[in-house]
């Protein structure tokens, strides 16, 4: 008795110790899980902080590069929007890949479903063929017997043999019916399982498709908003480089000092002619090169050839008319100098 009591006491003590160890292990596992979750959170925070630091450094470098340009803030905003657009493109790619995977999975499921249905149809046809081969005219014989009952049975050896054959046929037909019933039950069970699986898959697929459509609609709306913002920013800051070549008008006050010339100067080069209109009171210079080659004066539609002092040798052979006098050349030079001085003062 004492030995049994000691064994029982030691066994109870061992069980208590095991329970304590199990409880301690569970507590330690829970603490380890908590620490693991905290480490994952800290790791995610560190990754986000690193990404923020990298983006800040890139933004600082980009802002330093763009600070000297007149459209620096606009370029910075566009760079930030470009990053957002890149993120949206990546999300669109992931969504497209998921859609492709979903479509492939649905195709696989539908192929399996079609294969199962084809197998069921074949087995059903085979069962009908077997039944028709085993008892081809059961229904017809039953109808005939019901309308034309046969004579009474007589105890003869031929009738006994016929009865034994009919009994054996009935037993065989009963076995075949049992086999066909088992096959049909198994096939119906398989069909029901496949149908339930297909229903679950279709329900999940519809839910996933609706979620994807909502996400695509949201992304498209965000993309449209970003594009509108880009258009507005581009419209608010138009390009002013096309107006740099337009100069203010120049007026020539000393009109009496200019001598009128005849209309016989029409054979001179077209680049050196200057047409004078009655209504033009000032000169609109579209460019510096054109300002150096044309001047408009308010007179009664006369033609002037204002020569360039550097091109006297080249133009001496082309000028024709009544410009052989030295006085007219001096007057032309004075007119050219006055026009150049006015243009320089206006610039």
UniProtKB/Swiss-Prot annotation:
Q: Where is the signal peptide?
A: none
Is RNA-binding a UniProt keyword of this protein? no
Q: Where is the composition biased (Low complexity)?
A: 307-316
Per its UniProt record, what Pfam families does this chain match? SIKE (PF05769)
As for PTM, the annotation reads: O-glycosylated.
Polar residues bias spans: 153-174
Keyword entries, A-Z: Coiled coil, Glycoprotein
> Which positions are tagged coiled coil?
76-109, 206-233
Presence of keyword Coiled coil: yes
Q: Which InterPro entries match?
A: SIKE
For region Disordered, the annotated ranges are 149-177, 303-332
What family is this protein classified in? Belongs to the SIKE family.
Summary of the function given for this chain in its UniProt record: Involved in protection of the schistosome gut.
Question: Which PANTHER family does this entry report, sorted A to Z?
Answer: FGFR1 ONCOGENE PARTNER 2 HOMOLOG, SIKE FAMILY MEMBER
* Designated name of the protein: Circulating cathodic antigen
List the lineage, top down. Eukaryota, Metazoa, Spiralia, Lophotrochozoa, Platyhelminthes
């Amino acid at each position: 008795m004492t030995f049994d009591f000691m064994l029982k006491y030691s066994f109870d003590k061992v069980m208590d110790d095991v329970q304590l160890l199990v409880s301690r292990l569970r507590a330690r596992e829970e603490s380890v899980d908590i620490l693991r979750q905290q480490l994952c959170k800290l790791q995610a925070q560190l990754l986000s902080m690193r990404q923020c630091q990298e983006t800040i450094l890139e933004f600082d470098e980009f802002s330093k590069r763009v600070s000297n340009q007149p459209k620096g803030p606009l370029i910075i905003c566009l760079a930030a929007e470009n990053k957002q657009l890149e993120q949206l493109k990546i999300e669109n790619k992931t969504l497209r890949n998921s859609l492709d995977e979903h479509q492939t999975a649905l195709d696989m499921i539908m192929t399996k479903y079609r294969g199962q249905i084809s197998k069921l149809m074949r087995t059903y046809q085979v069962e009908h063929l077997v039944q028709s081969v085993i008892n081809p005219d059961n229904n017809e014989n039953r109808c005939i017997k019901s309308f034309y009952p046969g004579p009474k049975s007589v105890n003869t050896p031929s009738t006994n043999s016929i009865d034994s054959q009919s009994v054996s046929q009935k037993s065989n037909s009963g076995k075949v019916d049992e086999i066909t019933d088992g096959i049909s039950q198994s096939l119906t069970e398989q069909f029901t399982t496949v149908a339930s699986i297909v229903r679950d898959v279709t329900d999940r697929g519809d839910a996933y498709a609706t979620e994807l459509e909502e996400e695509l609609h949201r992304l498209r709306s965000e993309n449209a908003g970003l594009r509108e913002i880009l258009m507005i920013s581009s419209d608010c800051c138009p390009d002013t480089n096309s107006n740099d070549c337009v100069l203010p008008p120049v007026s020539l006050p000393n009109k009496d000092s200019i001598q009128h010339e005849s209309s016989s100067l029409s054979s001179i080069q077209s680049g050196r002619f200057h047409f004078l209109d009655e209504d033009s009171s000032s000169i609109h210079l579209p460019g510096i090169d054109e300002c150096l080659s044309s001047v408009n004066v308010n007179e009664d539609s006369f033609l002037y050839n204002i020569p360039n002092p550097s091109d006297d040798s080249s133009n001496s052979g082309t000028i024709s008319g009544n410009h052989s006098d030295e006085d007219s050349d001096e007057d032309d030079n004075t007119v050219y100098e006055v026009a150049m001085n006015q243009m320089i003062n206006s610039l």
